[in-house]
Structure formats: structure tokens, C-alpha cells
From Swiss-Prot:
Organism: Methylorubrum extorquens (strain CM4 / NCIMB 13688) (Methylobacterium extorquens)
Locations listed in the record: Cell inner membrane
Annotated protein name in UniProt: Potassium-transporting ATPase KdpC subunit
Sequence similarity: Belongs to the KdpC family.
GO molecular function, one term: P-type potassium transmembrane transporter activity
Functional note: Part of the high-affinity ATP-driven potassium transport (or Kdp) system, which catalyzes the hydrolysis of ATP coupled with the electrogenic transport of potassium into the cytoplasm. This subunit acts as a catalytic chaperone that increases the ATP-binding affinity of the ATP-hydrolyzing subunit KdpB by the formation of a transient KdpB/KdpC/ATP ternary complex.
Length: 201
């Protein structure tokens, strides 16, 4: 019986070592050598400190900043661990809300967001990504339309010409990956960092 088990055990140990240790270490080493910034998390550094990642969205709420998509991520309620509370862009709990199209709670949230955005920019259609969450709740990008929609609010808050802000958006525009995958987009963190630099001048 031991003769029959030995090949299976040897194969189990060998495949575990190859697929669980050697392969991940090799891929990590190659990624670190070829793409060091991406392998380290695509972190963005300013003045010697890390301010975020280009892959994970952040919550910007001030009137003078570009805002990302709504985030449905949650965290444990400090008062009652059996419940959750809203925690936008919580990377430790990446998920959507799982609210379906017939959900009254979802309809109420979208209605409130739409009303606020229409009041901010009357007469203009609200881009859909400013009222819908992504599947992960951590989307770092918005559509060019969503970024441009916010220009009048930021121009008023910062006392800047709208044309200058539109130029900033155009400068941060990323096209489709490989020319055909995904949609054109603007990274909100990168755009806000450029905006802060502009305000310092």
C-alpha cells in the first residue's frame, strides 16, 4: 500500500512546491524586475510621502476637488460589530452594494445623488458614472464626461477659468487600453494632484 501512496505523495509535494512556491516567487521576481512601480502597487508619491495608488479610488468630497464615482463599500460598525456602516473606498472590503434594479434603497440613493448633481450644474445631463457604483467600489477613474461635468463647480470654488480646468482634464485623459479595451477615462487622484499643483502657482 505504501508503494501506491508514495507516487501520489511525491506528486503532491512536488506540485505544491512548484505551483505554491516556485511559480509565485518567479512571477513576483519577473514583475518586480520588469515593472517595479506596478509590482509595488502603482503608488503615487508626493513630497516624500505616499498619497495613494493609481489603481484604487479615494473619497474626495470638497467642492474644490474632482469627485470619483459613488462607492458602496462598508466597514464594521464600531458600536455594533454585527452591523456595517458606509465607508466609501474601503479597500479592505471591496464590493458593490448588491442592490438590484428594483431596490427602493438604490432608487432613493440615485435620486438623491441626481438631485444634488443637477443643482450643482443645472441644465446639463448627469453622466451615469457619477450616480452608479462600480462592482469593486474602488474605481479610481471617471469618464471624461463626468470630469468635465464637475468643471463649473470647481471653477467657482477655486476662482479659476473653466477653460483652464478643461485643459487639465484633457491633459489627464487616458485612451482605451491597446486602443480597443475599455473606455476613455480620467484618473481622479492624478487629476486632483495636478489641480493642487495649479493652485500653488
Amino acid at each position: 500500500m505504501l508503494n501506491q501512496l508514495r507516487p501520489a505523495l511525491v506528486l503532491l509535494v512536488a506540485l505544491t512546491a512548484i505551483t505554491g512556491l516556485a511559480y509565485p516567487l518567479a512571477v513576483t521576481g519577473v514583475a518586480g524586475a520588469l515593472f517595479p512601480a506596478k509590482a509595488a502597487g502603482s503608488l503615487i508619491e508626493r513630497d516624500g510621502r505616499i498619497v495613494g495608488s493609481s489603481l484604487i479610488g479615494q473619497s474626495f468630497t470638497g467642492e474644490c476637488y474632482f469627485h470619483g464615482r459613488p462607492s458602496a463599500t462598508t466597514a464594521a460598525d464600531p458600536a455594533d460589530a454585527s452591523k456595517t456602516v458606509a465607508a466609501p473606498y474601503n479597500a479592505a472590503n471591496s464590493a458593490g452594494s448588491n442592490l438590484g434594479p428594483t431596490s427602493a434603497a438604490l432608487a432613493e440613493r440615485v435620486k438623491g445623488d441626481l438631485a444634488a448633481l443637477k443643482a450643482e450644474n443645472p441644465g446639463r445631463p448627469v453622466p451615469v458614472d457619477l450616480v452608479t457604483t462600480s462592482g469593486s467600489g474602488l474605481d479610481p477613474d471617471v469618464s471624461p464626461e463626468a470630469a468635465l461635468f464637475q468643471v463649473p463647480r470647481i471653477a467657482r470654488a477655486r476662482n479659476l477659468p473653466e477653460d483652464r480646468l478643461r485643459d487639465l482634464v484633457a491633459g489627464q485623459l487616458q485612451g482605451r487600453t491597446l486602443g480597443l479595451l475599455g473606455e476613455p477615462r480620467v484618473n481622479v487622484l492624478a487629476l486632483n494632484l495636478v489641480l493642487v499643483d495649479l493652485a500653488k502657482r
